Amino acid sequence: MAEVYLAAQRMQGDVVRPVVVKAILPHLVEDQRFVEDFMREARVAAMLSHPNIVKIHDVSVLNGRPCIVMEFLKGRDLWTVLTRLGDEGLAVGPQAAAAVIAQASAALDYAHRKRDRKGRPLDLVHRDISPHNLFLTREG
């Protein structure tokens, strides 16, 4: 559905920061419904501010492709960590597993309770919670 790139965002005063750019695949640019859904999700995600939710820096169109510019996280997705541990005959300990579940739950609870500027619930539901979409960093 989308490609993900590591990029450098240049800002005023020669400030450069690493970012991740998620761009719609070229063949989907003509699918108006997909583009509208992608952009709507990006705008909603940009409204979220929680320590366990990736920060959205910009929602834009780059080279004719809608894209999301987001915070670069240094770490690994949970799937990769679990796979590597399993390959070595190891497993995640109960405390670490509980910490991951607690932080993911806190982020989901925050998103689910999020309201718009007029106080109306956004009724957000994450449709793809999986080890591929949970990212582990040293910061949590």
Which role fits each region the language model picked out?
Residues 1-140:
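Conserved ATP-binding/catalytic core of the eukaryotic-like protein kinase fold
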